[in-house]
A protein has these predicted regions:
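Soluble catalytic domains of enzymes that build or remodel membrane lipids, polysaccharides, and related
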Residues: 158-167, 172, 193-194
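Short, hinge-like loop/turn segments at secondary-structure boundaries
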Residues: 130-133, 156-159, 196
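Alpha-helix N-cap and loop-to-helix initiation/capping positions
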Residues: 152-159, 218
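Terminal accessory/targeting
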Residues: 1-85, 103-112
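His/Asp/Glu-enriched short active-site or ligand-binding loop at hydrolase and phosphoryl-transfer sites
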Residues: 192-219
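A short acidic, helix-capping loop that chelates divalent metal ions and anchors anionic groups
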Residues: 145-152, 210-213
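Active-site beta->alpha N-cap acidic-glycine motif
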Residues: 57-149, 165-169, 176-177
Length: 219
């Protein structure tokens, strides 16, 4: 069983962020206490989230220092001493795979987090309800999936995440946790600051399974 979970994690993860089943408070605390890794300061202008990989068995590094990221409640990797894999999925459009993923997760008793955009909420409300019913967490990936680092005012930033929150709560009748993932991994210091001011925790990733090209989908 443990071996299969590791295989599932590598096969289907879009990023390493957190385990929904452990609870929001435990999650955030574990990230705050974890050994975040990085190499550069947070960019003041638009930056694409990037990773560096060292020797096999070591954690990757991000292109921002842990200290700078932590200032804005931003994380991408957990404590390397814990043998834990955090599964996340970015849901923009439904291509028939989400149901299969949910079935696999349920079969092997694995919890995950799904970052959703407005289009997914509008077109697949039943899948969103199923995510919640089966114990997964649903995070915020913005309504229109824009380059959020180009948004200069808090009100416009807030509308992108608030519209997702309102629709999610209308669909599920539950409060949405304030977990945010920047579309395309594009961010700036101002971007992360606005998210924090709105009460959000920002999560990047430490490994990505390249499945976002709609003309080159896995078969």
């Amino acid at each position: 069983m443990k071996k299969w979970k590791r295989i599932l994690a590598v096969a289907v993860m879009l990023a390493l962020v957190f385990c929904a089943g452990r609870g929001s408070a435990v999650l955030v605390k574990s990230w705050q206490n974890g050994g975040l890794l990085g190499v550069n300061a947070v960019a003041s202008t638009t930056e694409n989230w990037g990773l560096g990989f060292g020797e096999s068995g070591t954690q990757p590094t991000g292109n921002a220092t842990p200290e700078e990221l932590r200032k804005y409640n931003t994380y991408f990797i957990g404590n390397g001493d814990d043998k834990v894999i955090y599964l996340t999925f970015d849901c923009g459009y439904e291509n028939g795979n989400t149901e299969k993923i949910l079935e696999a997760l349920k079969k092997h008793d694995v919890k995950a987090t799904f970052f959703v955009v407005g289009h997914f909420l509008e077109t697949s409300p039943d899948l969103v309800r199923k995510m919640v019913e089966e114990g997964h967490t649903v995070g915020n990936h913005t309504y229109h999936h824009p380059d959020m680092s180009e948004i200069a005012d808090v009100s416009s930033f807030q509308k992108e995440v608030e519209d997702v929150k309102l629709l999610y709560e209308e669909i599920t009748d539950k409060e949405m946790v304030k977990y945010y993932r920047p579309p395309q991994g594009k961010y700036s210091e101002s971007n992360l600051k606005m998210a924090k001011e709105l009460g959000y925790y920002t999560f990047f990733w430490s490994l990505a399974y390249v499945d976002w090209y709609d003309t080159d989908q896995p078969t």
